[in-house]
Amino acid sequence: VDRVFLVCGGQKHLMVRVESKNDFDYYAYVMRLDDQKVSYYFEVQTGRITGIFDMRGLVQEVNEYYDFIIIPGFHTPDWAKGAVMYQIYTDRFCNGDSSNDVLTNEYCYIGEPVHRVEDWGRYPAQMDVREFYGGDLQGVLDKMDYLQDLGVEVIYFNPLFVSPSNHKYDIQDYDYIDPHIGKIVSDEGDLLPDGQRENRFASRYIDRVTNKANLEASNELFAQVVAEAHRRGMRVILDGVFNHCGSFNKWMDRERIYENAEGYDKGAYVSADSPYRNYFDFHNQAAWPYNNSYDGWWGHDTLPKLNYEGSQELMDYVLHVAKKWVSPPYNVDGWRLDVAADLGHSQEFNHHFWQEFRKAVKEANPEAIILAEHYGNTRDWLQGNEWDTVMNYDAFMEPVTWFLTGMEKHSDDYREDLLGNAESFWGAMRHHTSSFSMPSWQVAMNELSNHDHSRFLTRTNHKVGRTNTLGPQAAEQGINKAVFREGIVIQMTWTGAPTIYYGDEAGVCGFTDPDNRRTYPWGHEDQVLLAFHKDIIRLRRENEELRIGSLKMLENDYNFISYGRFNRKGQCAILINNNNHPITKEIHVWEIGTPKTGKMKVILQSRDDGYCMEGAEYEIRAGKVLIEMPQTSATILKYVEE
């Protein structure tokens, strides 16, 4: 290389060579930043050849979409960079306190009585939202040793606030943890009699969810959960549902639960004089009392859309909620934001809200993370003044799923043209990762499965369908655990925060929701998969380059990808053979900073018949390693100094 330029704002700045090591020259340029975002790329000149280096790598043409980005003043929490997260759907994780279980006929939800499931191992019903298995926060406390032993660094809870469903994305009261997963100290009243569908007569439920003794005891228990997690070095993220609430919500009160409860104002459904009337958009101003003409999210009357533009008081209150839970005595470490791009009635207001949300949260807890659910281009929200990062569907879950299984993430489609398609894999990764600045990418939530999609292990069977068409047993048939382990290796060696959906590590299967919300199989875990997760998480922790190192694509072929994770302290090469036959590959490891001669050692290899943590050593010759890989295998090689 003759010269290297930093190109920024249309100006070229000559860079200075500051170091040479292992056949690499290192160039630097120091520039003073103001408060404006900086986009840049590098121009590399050698002889008469000029190349452009941007987020795509070395290319011939400039494309500003792939420029590197620096956002002055923007940082994401160091604790979240590369952290191993664990998602808990509380009702299905562990029942530690049967006294708080939802009771059959306690109330009605979507027209039918709720049901307490007595058999922990039963498949979820097709209409699962009103079925309760009894998992709770005491169960999480009881399993803290398990989570710590697994290597979990962050617990992400699906919603925990008062709500009539098991998923709790229809929040009833943002100020309190649901006593059904918290603590019930007052348990007065009766169940609904047979044939009764009106929840204003559900006196047992009303006492459980409106009695301040229950609500405060539940909040206290949650504070204990967070404190215990912190004591063990783990963080906690809450799920925030702020685009909509539930029709049971005390602000709306369509079920008339709060209408006569002590200490509560009338809901907006009940009375035109409700202090919450402007929290919602009502289409018929003459329909009170019991006005059912409110705007629901995507038309769902169980999910009233919150009308922030119509009520500054509502916005102030939700920002108060956002601050409350990341502050003492709860001290939560961040928010995952449900359908965050849908909030408000315009994009302009949406951005305004999240800017104010960020200010509020970071003021209360500067090291709290703000992580949004989003599909599609995230760039507009990741400019340093709104979200920290996103659930990484486009630049992780989807490309990994297509490459390893050929399946769409709901198991709704099979694409043979994408199965094993390394070019498509890297194209998707490059394109979608370009939406991130480095601080956002390092904390992106990288999932293989979650509560909205089929379990990854089920996708390995290539069955297109859902539980209502194929039945739940089909989700377990023809699965390929070796392919699943390939996915785990990618997840645990990719840039970002690998996030395990509870039970994946134990071999739980399931089509898309509700079947993906099966219970954790305590006492019936797949011990090999569980041990594999523990071992690879330990490797990630012991080898810093796997957690926060740079990532570089290496050799690729049909059904084969390889890439490096590296920094000045260590270099690892990750090789994935998704073929059903062995292959031999030559890997140019010098590109990740190894010497031209030396050795690389297998520190993990997964195969059809299991896995091992130690394997052969391979000679580096002229910067390359020649390696034989078994079928359906994943290998991590690490450079070892002699």
Kindly give the residue locations of the regions a language model identified:
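Carbohydrate-interacting/catalytic domains
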Residues: V1-Y89, N95, D101-L103, A125, ...
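Short, flexible loop/turn elements at secondary-structure junctions
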Residues: M31-D35, T46, Y89-C94, F161, ...
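Loop/turn elements at helix/coil->beta-strand transitions in domains of secreted/extracellular proteins
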Residues: G82-A83, L150-I155, H230-I237, Y330-W335, ...
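Conserved, mostly hydrophobic/aromatic
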Residues: I88, L147, F157, Y174, ...
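Substrate-binding/active-site clefts of carbohydrate-active enzymes
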Residues: T90-E153, L160-P329, F357, E363, ...
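Short, solvent-exposed turn/loop segments enriched in Gly/Ser/Thr/Pro and often Arg
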Residues: T90-R92, I155-H167, L238-N249, D338-L343, ...
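Conserved alpha/beta catalytic core and glycan-binding cleft of carbohydrate-active enzymes
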Residues: F248-D253, A322, P329-N331, W354, ...
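Active-site cleft segment of glycoside hydrolase catalytic domains centered on the general acid/base Glu
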Residues: P304-Q312, V339-R358
